Amino acid sequence: MSDQIDTRTAWLSPDLLASVRANVPLVYVDAIPVRVDESGRVTQVGLLLRVASDGSISRMLVSGRVLYGERVRDALIRHLEKDLGPLALPKVPANPAPFTIAEYFPDPDISGFVDPRHHAVSLAYVVPVSGDCTPTQQALDLAWFTPAEAASAKIAADMTGGQDRLLRLALAHVGELP
């Protein structure tokens, strides 16, 4: 078993991960990084530019797997810092609650949320960040948009896998869907 799981990081071997993806839904987190004003109103939405699971270059949310033995809060912080840099300073509550749950399937007709690799259940959060955000890891760019720009058809056309729908749900949740 030790050759299948790195117990220090809870990562599965590539072969075991492929087997799990083929047979078991995985738990993910999606995070919409936002900047807020002094009253807490969302003024900007951060979107990454990266290679999506379908191979396209797309605007995307912060997203990633929750590791075995990892708290959801810790997974959120890990993925936010991995994609936005260690100085992003995300404001994640002690016990975060998702604004929605998105189920990603290889088949686009099931839920409208698509990941060609597997079935994933993703807890979605809006997370204010107050620090210096710089794209890292696989992200090619990070751009900040007003809520109206983020909800536009132009941005939706640059997104894939149904993440534009998740972004609009997030904007509605914070009262910023135009």
Describe these PLM feature segments.
Residues G85-C133:
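Active-site segment of metal-dependent pyrophosphate-handling enzymes
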